[in-house]
């Protein structure tokens, strides 16, 4: 069987859903989202009045009249909407240019067809205003009848008459304002007359009437005034209407801002209607029928009120236009002092204080509701909750009024270029009223108040169900307690004293609204007979239900009770004199309290109206007033119009740009100022679009207005996301740049007084980045996703810029590139806390074009710079271990042409202009040389694959063509120029003689024209290639060692711990291993991972451990590859004649290099560049590498010409000038180069011998006999094989 679930259980299950946490839990920094919900409207407009037959018949009749007047008010609202939202049609309709135009008839027919429905609306409007004036004047006439003057008129009825006065004022001002209505009707009438559509006299007369009605200014106002002046005593009734408005305004007997402003408009227009030839309002003031001083104070505090939409009016203007206006009676309103309404900063402290107090109280109540469950709260708790809800609505209404009143005042008081220096002279009217009419402080205050309104609206809407239930229970209990209990005493006295009218009214109240427990009034109640209760009291149990009274019920109860306390009651004396004072106070208190019940019962609608700020977007009045004109250029300062003679262009448009729209002005102000305290409020001004769209659909019911709101929202939100994304990226990029900046450098800057504000202030972007579903025009927008998309693009641009910047510089830019990428990585890490950005390494690969290609832009540019600039133009110095650019360019290649990096904002580089300057200074240190920092950066950026590619290309495209090309050709040429034989002269010749000997034999080599240019340049390029490969390997080895040290802790590798005496190192080592056991990758993966994961972990661990232990050497491979290129016979020469070694012959490369070394050891004159300055040590490295690879090192060291001069000079110590060469200077140079060559040979031999086996230290010795003197050597036996000699001796 299916289990039955009670309603209580079902409801409790639904309430449990509130405990479910949303997956995103985004901070609430936006207004109430618009949801699709069912709203029940229990306002019946007195349709159920006939059901209350027990009520006083007079008030039921009044309810009938009320219902009819409300229908007229609703119809008037529709006509007001029609007029306000009217857009000029005639401007869009083509007009015939001449009477001979062939399609003139067709144009007129289409004009009539298009405009006929709109003209019918205007006719209906004219008929309506007649009907409404007749109905209003009829009611005034009825109430002003001599027999009715002393009759009681209810507060609600007087308020309805006030609403009529307000309606007439609004309709009249709208009709006056809309010139497009007159233009459209003129266009229609012209077309209709041409086509003779209006043929009958009645139609013509109505057309004429409509034309006059539209053309006459203040037609409705004057008609109402003329009609009322014919009614005797109308001023007394209007005095009551004005007085009730004054009373309600001063006692805050209103709830929505619209009602508050309506009261003020009724005061102004009502006094204007009263002031006539027959009635002087100043005399009425003297008679105390009205209080002008109180109204004057109200008019001063509220100089301007919204009229309709963006239309506004100064109520005091009605008084100024009255017949008996006396400025002395209006001292405050006539003064030039600015109204408090115009200064939002005056209201702000109190608003903040009220907001904090109320939010605290509401939060406490919300926490209490969510943490404790009470099935039936007490009456006191319900009353507190209802009061809390009412106070919240009142605060919201008050704050909304402050905003709309300020906006209205600003619209009526636009600024100009004299008051605001930022306002251009040619700024148009609406622009001066909105864009330039608010100071920065006012904008921030406006944003803050709007945020308070929208934020509180969200909080109250969240607990709407709880509040509404408490409101209904409280209203029910208070109404029933009052009717069933509090009215017993006045009823008893009325029965006892035979006050039949009072008794009948009280009985009607009880019968209308009492909800007796048994369904009927107790028959044995002593009160009904005027008797006292028994000694034990008469017990009446009042039920408690969750239901409120109907609108008609509430109206009947309040009106009948009001009749008991009113000053007018229709008789000679008022009824209140017959009621006990205590009871009278109870009735008045109940009457005042119940005024708000209709608002509370419609809590949702009231909350919406109290927070409605749609007025801040609408601009129909200004569109009509300016007709969309924008003055592009006019040389004269005046109010521009179409007749301006100096006007060059006047553009017409149907809408204002977003820069003049208040929602965007406020939103953009936050984004422009980047004020941290306001950043979390940035979504609240955008909610003004929600209000405007809601108003367009529910009140105006105009699709085109909604479309315009939607179009602006589309544009503004795109701008908002774009600007916000740029700001967030710039903020975090600046933060990353500040974090990455060298701390010592920053400290030195601060010491020197250069403060570049490196660390940006916290701007509270985190809250915005957590917004996953921003509600805008019914759309749920993932702001986080949109910002992520844009910041992803910005990250790509930033990385792209870093690489492009490197491509625009020489090889020294590699250090800055690494820094830029690291700053971007930090920025990416900071942003990744809130945004799902692409993988940073993937971004770098994509920007580097290295996703699928074996090498990327960085590798390619490194090689290009090496090939065309670095290898050919840089000189190496072993003392500093750096390359520097040569002073003279001897390269045959053209200078490299680099593209300029793209121009982008500062934040794409390092984050800000100041940081860019700081980093430019910091990385400027690395631009004058290429050294260890550059090689380390290359290793980290290129990686193994990039390094392998670069080295492979260097060998194939640079080294091999050099060796087998230019160097080979030069070697062959110079070998021919070398002497056939060049001996080592004996020491007896002395060092000057030896030098002269070599100088004479090597004349051709010394004087060879290309030796010190092309030949040495080729050797320099070759040597630089070798040095580059060596330094790259050294840097790579250091990086690998660093990786190993970093990984040691995770591989169970610990440094030997320090041990005290009598402490075993093994025990301490074990404690260390146990302490860091959780960090051991392999063991942990083997425990909790799969077999495949464990295998991968073991292989990774093995690779990390053995990477450097294998003794792998890139440089050895490089040398062996180079050795393979030295395959031409010219390098080794022909076999020696003696079968052993060339001693005096110049047929091997080392002899040529000895000659070249003799050339560059010759001292230069004072003004010439030395070989070291021109070519660096790459020249020496090239020769030494080739000598070692050819196996000629020992021969070179033994038979070198320069070394021989050095050895001889050390013995004799002579210093002479030998044919222009200072011997001592040359010997000094020889010694330096000998040391350098020894170092190079040492390095090369270390790498080349590192690859041999363990027995490589065993030398293969060949035995030769000692040399003999030529005189004892026979011609036939110049040389004997030692083996043969041994054999002959044995034989």
From Swiss-Prot:
Protein's GO biological process: axon guidance; cell projection assembly; chaeta development; cortical actin cytoskeleton organization; regulation of actin filament polymerization; regulation of cell shape; regulation of synapse organization
An example Gene Ontology CC term for this record: SCAR complex
Record's subcellular location: Cytoplasm
Biased composition (Polar residues): 1271-1291
Region of interest (Disordered), residue spans: 1269-1291
Signal sequence, renumbered to the chain: none
Molecular-function annotations in GO: small GTPase binding
InterPro entries: CYRIA/CYRIB_Rac1-bd, Cytoplasmic_FMR1-int
UniProt keyword list: Cell shape, Cytoplasm, Developmental protein, Differentiation, Neurogenesis
Family annotation (Pfam families): CYRIA-B_Rac1-bd, FragX_IP
Subunit structure: Interacts with Fmr1 and Rac1. Component of the WAVE complex composed of Hem/Kette, Scar/Wave and Cyfip where it binds through its C-terminus directly to Hem.
General function of this protein: Plays a role in guidance and morphology of central and peripheral axons and in synaptic morphology. Also required for formation of cell membrane protrusions and for bristle development.
Family indicated by similarity: Belongs to the CYFIP family.
Protein name (database record): Cytoplasmic FMR1-interacting protein
Organism: Drosophila pseudoobscura pseudoobscura
């Amino acid at each position: 069987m299916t289990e039955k679930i009670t309603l209580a259980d079902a409801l409790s299950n639904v309430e449990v859903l509130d405990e479910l946490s949303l997956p995103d839990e985004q901070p609430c920094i936006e207004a109430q989202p618009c949801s699709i919900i069912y709203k029940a409207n229990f306002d019946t407009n007195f349709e159920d009045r006939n059901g209350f037959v027990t009520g006083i018949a007079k008030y039921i009749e009044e309810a009938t009249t009320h219902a009819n007047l409300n229908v007229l008010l609703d119809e008037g609202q529709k006509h007001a909407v029609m007029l306000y939202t009217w857009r000029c049609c005639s401007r869009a309709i083509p007009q015939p240019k001449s009477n001979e135009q062939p399609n003139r008839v067709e144009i007129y027919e289409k004009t009539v067809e298009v405009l006929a429905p709109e003209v019918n609306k205007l006719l209906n409007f004219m008929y309506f205003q007649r009907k409404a004036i007749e109905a209003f004047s009829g009611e005034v006439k009825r109430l002003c009848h001599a027999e009715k003057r002393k009759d009681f008129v209810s507060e609600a009825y007087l308020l309805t008459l006030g609403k009529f006065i307000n309606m007439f004022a609004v309709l009249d001002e709208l009709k006056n304002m809309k010139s497009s209505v007159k233009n459209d009707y003129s266009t229609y009438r012209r077309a209709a007359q041409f086509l003779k559509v209006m043929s009958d006299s009645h139609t013509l007369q109505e057309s004429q009437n409509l034309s006059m009605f539209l053309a006459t200014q203040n037609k409705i106002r004057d008609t109402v005034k003329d009609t009322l002046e014919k009614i005797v005593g109308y001023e007394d009734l209007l005095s009551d209407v004005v007085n009730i408005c004054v009373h309600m305004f001063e006692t805050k007997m209103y709830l929505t801002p619209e009602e508050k402003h309506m009261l003020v408009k009724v005061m102004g227009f009502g006094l204007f209607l009263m002031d006539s030839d027959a009635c002087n309002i100043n005399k009425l003031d003297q008679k105390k029928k009205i209080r002008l001083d109180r109204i004057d104070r109200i008019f001063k505090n509220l100089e301007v009120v919204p009229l309709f939409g963006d239309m506004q009016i100064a109520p005091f203007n009605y008084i100024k236009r009255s017949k008996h206006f006396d400025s002395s009676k209006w001292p405050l309103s006539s003064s030039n002092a600015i109204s408090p309404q115009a200064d939002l900063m005056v209201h702000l402290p109190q608003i903040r204080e009220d907001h904090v107090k109320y939010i605290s109280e509401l939060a406490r109540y919300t926490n209490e509701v969510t943490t404790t469950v009470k099935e039936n709260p007490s009456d006191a708790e319900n009353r507190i909750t209802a009061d809390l809800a009412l106070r919240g609505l009142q605060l919201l209404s008050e704050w909304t009024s402050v905003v709309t009143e300020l906006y209205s005042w600003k619209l009526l008081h636009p600024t100009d270029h004299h008051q605001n220096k930022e306002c251009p002279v040619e700024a148009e009217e609406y622009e001066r009223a909105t864009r330039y009419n608010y100071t920065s402080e006012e904008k921030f205050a406006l944003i803050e108040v709007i945020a308070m309104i929208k934020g509180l609206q969200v909080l109250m809407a969240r607990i709407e169900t709880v509040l509404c239930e408490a409101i209904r229970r409280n209203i029910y209990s208070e109404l029933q307690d009052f009717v069933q209990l509090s009215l017993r005493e006045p009823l008893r006295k009325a029965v006892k004293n035979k006050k039949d009218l009072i008794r009948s009214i009280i009985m009607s109240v009880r019968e209308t609204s009492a909800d007796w427990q048994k369904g009927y009034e107790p028959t044995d109640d002593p009160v009904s007979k005027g008797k006292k209760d028994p000694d034990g009291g008469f017990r009446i149990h009042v039920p408690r239900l969750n239901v409120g009274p109907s609108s008609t019920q509430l109206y009947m109860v309040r009106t009948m009770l009001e009749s008991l306390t009113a000053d007018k009651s229709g008789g000679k004396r008022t009824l209140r004199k017959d009621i006990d004072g205590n009871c009278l106070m109870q009735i008045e208190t109940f009457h005042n309290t119940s005024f708000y019940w209709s608002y509370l019962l419609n809590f949702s609608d009231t909350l919406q109206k109290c927070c409605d700020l749609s007025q801040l977007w609408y601009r129909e009045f200004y569109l009509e007033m300016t007709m969309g004109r924008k003055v592009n250029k006019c040389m004269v300062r005046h109010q521009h119009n179409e007749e301006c003679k100096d006007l060059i262009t006047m553009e017409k448009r149907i809408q204002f740009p977003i820069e003049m729209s208040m929602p965007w002005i406020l939103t953009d102000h936050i984004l422009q100022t980047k004020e941290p305290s306001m950043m979390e409020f940035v979504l609240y001004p955008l909610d003004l679009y929600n209000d405007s769209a809601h108003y367009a659909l529910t009140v105006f019911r105009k699709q085109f207005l909604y479309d315009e709101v939607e179009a602006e929202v589309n544009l503004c939100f795109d701008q908002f996301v774009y600007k916000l994304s740029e700001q967030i990226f710039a903020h975090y990029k600046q933060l990353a740049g500040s974090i990455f900046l060298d701390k010592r450098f920053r400290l030195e800057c601060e010491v020197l007084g250069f403060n570049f504000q490196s660390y940006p202030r916290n701007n509270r972007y985190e809250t915005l980045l957590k917004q996953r579903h921003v509600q805008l025009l019914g759309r749920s927008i993932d702001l986080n996703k949109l910002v992520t998309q844009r910041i992803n693009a910005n990250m790509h641009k930033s990385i792209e810029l870093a690489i492009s910047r490197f491509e625009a510089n020489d090889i020294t830019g590699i250090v800055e590139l690494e820094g830029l990428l690291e700053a971007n990585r930090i920025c990416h890490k900071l942003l990744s806390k809130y945004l799902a950005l692409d993988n940073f390494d993937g971004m770098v690969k994509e920007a580097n074009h290295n996703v699928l290609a074996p090498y990327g832009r960085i590798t390619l540019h490194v090689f290009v710079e090496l090939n065309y600039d670095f290898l050919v133009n840089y000189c190496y110095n072993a003392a500093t271990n750096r390359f520097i650019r040569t002073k003279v360019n001897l390269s045959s290649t053209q200078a490299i042409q680099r593209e300029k990096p793209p121009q982008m904002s500062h934040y794409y580089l390092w984050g800000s202009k100041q940081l860019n300057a700081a980093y430019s200074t910091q990385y400027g240190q690395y631009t004058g040389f290429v050294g260890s920092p550059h090689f380390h950066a290359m290793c980290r950026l290129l990686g193994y694959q990039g390094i392998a590619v670069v080295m492979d290309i260097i060998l194939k495209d640079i080294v091999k063509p050099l060796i087998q090309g230019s160097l080979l050709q030069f070697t062959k040429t110079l070998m021919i120029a070398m002497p056939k034989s060049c001996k080592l002269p004996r020491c007896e010749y002395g060092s000057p003689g030896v030098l002269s000997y070599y100088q004479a034999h090597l004349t051709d080599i010394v004087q060879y024209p290309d030796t010190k240019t092309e030949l040495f340049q080729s050797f320099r390029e070759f040597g630089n290639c070798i040095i580059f490969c060596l330094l790259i390997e050294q840097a790579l080895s250091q990086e690998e060692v660093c990786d190993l040290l970093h990984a040691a802790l995770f591989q169970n590798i610990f440094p030997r711990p320090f041990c005290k005496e009598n402490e075993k190192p093994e025990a301490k080592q074990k404690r260390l291993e146990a302490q860091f056991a959780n960090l051991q990758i392999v063991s942990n993966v083997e425990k909790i991972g799969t077999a495949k994961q464990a295998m991968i972990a073991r292989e990774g661990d093995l690779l990390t451990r053995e990477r450097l232990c294998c003794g792998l050497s890139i440089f050895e491979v490089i040398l062996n590859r180079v050795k393979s290129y030295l395959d031409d016979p010219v390098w080794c020469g022909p076999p020696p004649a003696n079968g052993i070694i060339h001693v005096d012959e110049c047929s091997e490369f080392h002899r040529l290099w000895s000659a070249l070394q003799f050339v560059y050891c010759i001292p230069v004159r004072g003004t010439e560049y030395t070989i070291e300055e021109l070519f660096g040590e790459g020249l020496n490295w090239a020769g030494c590498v080739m000598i070692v690879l050819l196996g000629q090192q020992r021969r070179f060291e033994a038979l070198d010409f320069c070394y021989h001069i050095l050895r001889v000079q050390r013995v004799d110590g002579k210093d002479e000038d030998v044919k222009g060469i200072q011997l001592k200077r040359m010997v000094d140079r020889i010694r330096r180069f000998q040391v350098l060559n020894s170092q190079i040979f040492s390095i090369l031999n270390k790498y080349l011998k590192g690859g041999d086996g363990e027995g490589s230290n065993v030398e293969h010795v060949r035995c030769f006999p000692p040399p003999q003197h030529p005189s004892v050597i026979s011609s036939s036996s110049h040389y004997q094989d030692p083996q043969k000699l041994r054999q002959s001796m044995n034989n």
